[in-house]
Design a protein with these regions (language model features):
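Cyclophilin-like peptidyl-prolyl cis-trans isomerases
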Residues: 2-233
Length: 233
């Protein structure tokens, strides 16, 4: 009796294949196969169109390529790390580094922020009191290979090109008009670039502003420079 047993699978194979059964199978398989082909095509297209997606995400921030010092700017909205181009703009870089090491910037605020332009600080306390650099003004130092790219740090100054002291700004986006021959024939000294924390720059640049102490574009809620420390110097 055991020889007469046929498993369920074998029974299915033993059934006669009719035109109707073939049609039913094909009718079910055709849309299924089409769906598989479409999915394969979609996946292939995604792989072709986005082969460098991860690379693009990781290269949106600048990376230090030399042994230059790194300024760690701790603010009330987060930390910004800036490579200071001591190798390319030494006098301006050393002025900033010396002020940071002397704890000059600790507790000051970003007193002027304009979205899509820049964030500026290093000269005023939260109550509007101006703080003067103990080192006095420095000469304008322009390196033609250092540009006002997104995240560049530069020195603020008055109409006199050699009047920069302690106030600095960080570009929120590319600012070619700050190069020599732009809004000012002499240009503004750029001396480094953000390597981490450009999102913090964006956040600061996006806050609501008002007029305080006779100055416009002052953040409604103070953004404090808690400290600036220098690494690798």
């Amino acid at each position: 009796m055991s020889s007469n047993r046929i498993s369920e699978t074998e029974r299915k194979r033993s059934r006669p294949v009719t035109k109707r059964s073939v049609f039913k199978k094909n009718k079910w398989l055709s849309p299924f196969l089409v769906l598989i082909i479409v999915l394969i095509a979609i996946v292939s297209t995604i792989l072709v169109l986005n082969p460098f997606e991860e690379t693009e995400k990781t290269t949106t921030s600048n990376s230090p390529t030399t042994g230059n010092p790194i300024a760690v700017i701790d603010t009330s909205l987060g930390t910004i790390r800036v490579e200071i181009y001591k190798d390319k703009v030494p006098n301006t870089a050393n002025n900033f580094i010396n002020l940071a090491k002397a704890r000059f910037y600790d507790g000051l605020v970003f007193h002027r922020v304009i979205k899509g332009f820049m964030i500026q600080g290093g000269g005023f306390e939260a109550d509007g009191t101006q703080k003067q650099s103990p080192y006095g003004p420095i000469d304008l130092e322009i390196n033609p290979n250092v540009h006002h790219v997104d995240g560049a740090i530069g020195m603020a100054r008055g109409s006199d090109p050699n009047s920069a002291t302690s106030q600095f700004f960080i570009d929120d986006g590319n600012q070619p008009q700050l190069e020599p021959g732009g809004v000012d024939v002499n240009g503004y000294a750029a001396f480094g670039v953000v390597v981490e924390g450009i999102d913090v720059v964006r956040a600061i640049a996006s806050v609501d502003t008002t007029t305080k102490y006779g100055m416009g574009d002052w953040p409604v809620n103070d953004i404090t420079i808690e400290s600036i420390t220098i690494e690798n110097d």
